[in-house]
UniProtKB/Swiss-Prot annotation:
It comes from Enterobacter sp. (strain 638). Belongs to the tetrahydrofolate dehydrogenase/cyclohydrolase family. GO terms for biological process: L-histidine biosynthetic process; methionine biosynthetic process; purine nucleotide biosynthetic process; tetrahydrofolate interconversion. Homodimer. Pathway: One-carbon metabolism; tetrahydrofolate interconversion. It holds the Pfam family THF_DHG_CYH_C. It comes from the Bacteria. CDD domains: NAD_bind_m-THF_DH_Cyclohyd (cd01080). This is Bifunctional protein FolD. GO terms for molecular function: methenyltetrahydrofolate cyclohydrolase activity; methylenetetrahydrofolate dehydrogenase (NADP+) activity. GO terms for cellular component: cytosol. The lineage of its organism: Bacteria, Pseudomonadati, Pseudomonadota, Gammaproteobacteria, Enterobacterales.
């Protein structure tokens, strides 16, 4: 069996185009364009690339894009003060603070300071809690993007055995909640999991997010499984690969996401979706 490729680039472009149409309709009706503030602290090269792609996507869909590039020496108090200012700014619908933050700044404190109605990354306890209670509003970007991919490929998830490899706050944990909402029987594995291979071999739908190149061998994949590879790993030779041995897995799976070009583009597209949603669901009411 040769797997069908789940093309994240194409779906992400569709999502962005749909948002652009809605933004154009808003402005034509005399409403303001949604606004996103992107905050980068320090000069981490990978973070600069991610932030650049987010800002570019904002401009493409017609958002107001605000950039705040702060020096490595920025204190936690200074960053919190900026967030307070942005929380009160009526032009801004979404606030994104690029992680990781420099040493000495508490990630949790910073993310919790963002107003839940401007938390377009979906990391605030309020938004995570709503997802857990089956009443999601702003949802974490990567898990929501993965659900969008499955939906756009008309993959019926109800009743599937879904296995999530990795239990991070950004992907693994919220992904497990999304999969429960999607009707899956869901297992989350982590560094203490025994018999990992057995779990993988049982998966109808496998989501891998550990950040280790080739962590899951292709021969572990169940015949006909759907494989979603969240990993983005750059090898010494410059090649970018996922957490799954792609060629071997693709020979057994029914669907698979490539790396690059699978999940990555969806994370940015979902951030754009979330910003429009925050504008429409939370901030339009205040304008009325």
């Amino acid at each position: 069996m040769a797997a069908k490729i789940i093309d994240g680039k194409t779906i992400a472009q569709q999502v962005r185009s749909e948002v652009a149409v809605k933004v154009k309709a808003r402005t034509a009706a005399g409403k303001r364009a949604p606004g996103l503030a992107v905050v980068l602290v320090g000069s981490n090269p990978a973070s600069q690339i991610y932030v650049g792609s987010k800002r570019k996507a904002c401009e493409e869909v017609g958002f107001v894009s605000r950039s705040y590039d702060l020096p490595e020496t920025t204190t936690e108090a200074e960053l919190l003060e900026l967030i307070d200012t942005l929380n009160a700014d009526e032009v801004i619908d979404g606030i994104l603070v690029q992680l990781p933050l420099p040493a000495g700044i508490d990630n949790v404190k910073v993310l919790e300071r963002i107003a839940p109605d401007k938390d377009v990354d979906g990391f605030h306890p309020y938004n995570v809690g709503r997802l857990c209670q089956r009443a999601p509003r702003l949802r974490p970007c990567t898990p929501r993007g993965i659900v969008t991919l499955l939906e756009r490929y008309n993959i019926d998830t109800y009743g599937l055995n879904a296995v999530v490899i990795g239990a991070s706050n950004i992907v693994g944990r919220p992904m497990s909640m999304e999969l429960l909402l999607a009707g899956c029987t869901t297992t989350v594995t982590h560094r203490f999991t025994k018999n990992l291979r057995q779990h993988v071999e049982n998966a109808d739908l496998l989501i891998v997010a550990v950040g280790k190149p080739g962590f899951i061998p292709g021969e572990w994949i169940k015949e006909g499984a759907i494989v979603v590879d969240v990993g983005i790993n750059r090898l010494e030779n410059g090649k970018v690969v996922g957490d799954v041995v792609y060629e071997d897995a693709a020979a057994r799976a029914s669907y698979i996401t490539p790396v690059p070009g699978g999940v990555g583009p969806m994370t940015v597209a979902t951030l754009i979706q979330n910003t429009l949603q925050a504008c429409e669901e939370y901030h339009d009411v205040e304008e009325a």
